[in-house]
């Protein structure tokens, strides 16, 4: 048979696919309900899979000018480098998927020095990558359709972009033509309104990080 092709063969963090599986494996490994009936051998297999998954997470954490940052939504399964998925999902740093990845790492018991470094680096990236003074608002456009746009908001909490450039860390947007753009208004109506381009996922990272620091210091 031909080798499988397409982005779905890559390491996929997009839409929390891998992290959801890792959470499931953790429940199996811990014998959490409804997996209490599973034998010890199955629980051990789940733990081995978790260990491999964590190793993969650490290998795929992107370095930007020699500094650990966060993750792309998908990575090449051979090289671990950031990879393209759909036409509008270019290799990048993800301000969405990376949140749940680092939160997962913070939930590990007895984290290694490498895991701790990974967490600290990712949290610092979230701090450095805050987008302040904006919000996403709905409005009725000139065609009478409900639309979305970026608007100023000095009192709003920080936001994070779905995609940041690998080299510059600049937030960007992209339409189905695969062309990178830097303003939400520059992409078409369908993608502008059909994708989560900006989010506040970093808030959950900060909350979990505060609790994690307390646990680590004990």
Question: Model segments located where?
Answer:
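Terminal, non-catalytic domain-edge segments
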Residues: 27-52, 79-85, 89, 96-218
